[in-house]
Amino acid sequence: MDAVVRPEPQTTELHRTIDWKDAFWVASGVPALVLFSIGGIAGTVGNPACAVWAVSMLFGFVQSFTYAEIAGLFPNKSGGASVYGAAAWLKYSKLIAPLSVWCNWLAWTPVLSLGCTIAAGYILNAFAPIPAADAPAVQQWLATHGGKTAVDAAAALTPGIRTWSMLDMTLIGVHISLGATFFIGVALTLIVFAIQHRGILGTARVQMVVGLLVIIPMLVFGIVPFFNGHVSQANFSPFVPLATPYAAAPGAWNRSGWTLVLGGLFIAAWSTYAFETAICYTSEFKNPGRDTFNAIFSSGLLCIVIFTLVPFTFQGFLGVKGMISPGVVDGTGVAAVMADMVGGGALTKGLLVLLMVLALLLSTMTAMAGSSRTLYQGSVDGWLPRYLSHVNTHGAPTRAMWTDLTFNLMLLSLTSSDTASFYFVLALSNCGYIIFNFLNLNAGWIHRIDNGHIARPWKAPAFVIAAGAVLAFVNAMLLGAGARVWNPHALWAGFVAAALIIPVFWFRHYVQDGGRFPARMLEDLGSVDGQLGERRAGVLPYVALAGGVLVVLVSAWVFRP
């Protein structure tokens, strides 16, 4: 039996002020995550890229039903599936439970820095563009500088703000830069923080307006090209992976090709699974029993449409050669492509730049809302330092938000430096996300065994829970096979980042709480005085963990980049 300790008094608690429609709008930033890696996946996988997005989205949708069920067990918790899943693992390991929460936060919080990096790139392109090779200024420069190339001309005519940097260095093979992109990204991050400071209801209202401005155009660009003849069947043939990433030469369905496809599925999961954030707000729902399922189901349907249509039309319009162009790979040229897809001119492109900035800010607002509540609930439940359990009078977890902000200002120095560092952070973040998904998909059946007597507002069919458990091991394979496609150090760096929870949890649990858990941690499961109850699942959770580790190691060995 675990003794319990009462948490320190809080200024206030999260407020029950929203319903599922508000959560839907808060999660409406998830479809914009397609913009983060649409070029990277196409440049890595080739013509099967659109199928990669569709398959990954199918995985995410099936998994969401497990998360919807376990969220219903905890009407008084916030923070998302990682928090609800952690309660299942607690009986079996004090360390695995906080690992779930930590890895979820590691996955979500970098959205702020990654999104603001791309948005800053859009802003720089609008006000200080790099001249195109056929620009009049370039031609004039070449005429007066004999023997020079268009590359020389572009370098000479590039505005100084594009190359200026207060700090430029390489640390452990990763480029760090404090240039214009960094400082614009800082400004955008502060704007997101200011909006979030008003609480979840105010955030939902802002995101509803921004979401409509973003989602409707994305639907237009996903549908119109089918009717104006801008989707070419030839751009999907031959339907084989690339021989080498970012080179348009077709490869084959051999081990090398499958490695690239699994790498694409790995990084796509970071975007396509992310609508599970809709259940981060259970303790803020007016009617959690109804709102929890409706929120994640409606968000999932929206994501199915966006994540299926947009990659398909992009590829059908551009082809692989267009998809691997630098502007598409780094995300800053997507607006121009969208304008061309619907036949727009300069005005349309300008409006789309604004919409893309709004889309990226929408995704960062979604990320801060969810990740800060994960930190908050992790603190309330005794996983993370007590400092994070404070909320302001609007019901916003401000100390968790400040932690998110500070961490992402540091990440911005990496993500804003170059494309390689951007994808390293993305891959590292996704290692945490896959670990979280593995633990929480298994938490579904553990809760069924250990807490089957607890009423569930919505209960998934047994075969769906079983399918989620199978997908847990599919995700483990994607982790082992796919992470190193994006960076040779990503997999092991991801394990190191995940292990950082050990000193954090040790400090909270043994230093701050004296080895005891807060009394309210398991109140939704009917726990009395912190009793964890019988381990009815026996050794099965340990078998699942061992199996997951084995799958990661074997797939990492078999699918070596």
Model-derived regions, located:
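Hydrophobic, membrane-embedded alpha-helices of multi-pass small-molecule transporters
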Residues: I18-F36, S56, S64, I184-I191, ...
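TM-loop-TM module centered on a large, flexible mid-protein loop between adjacent transmembrane helices
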Residues: S82-L90, L124-A155, F239-A252, A295-M365, ...
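Membrane-interface loop-to-helix entry segments
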Residues: A180-V240, I296-G300, L426-L439, A466, ...
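Extracellular loop-to-transmembrane helix junctions
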Residues: V34-W141, H145, P159, S165-V174, ...
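Membrane-helix boundary/coupling elements in multi-pass transport proteins
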Residues: G79, C103-G121, I267-F285, A346-P385, ...
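C-terminal membrane-solvent junction of multi-pass transporters and transport-like membrane proteins
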Residues: S177-A180, H390-A396, N437-N487, F507, ...
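Hydrophobic alpha-helical segments and their helix-loop junctions in multi-pass secondary transporters
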Residues: G121, A126-A128, L212-Y246, T313-L318, ...
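Membrane-interface "cap" regions at the ends of multi-pass membrane proteins
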Residues: M1-C50, A54, G60-A68, N76, ...
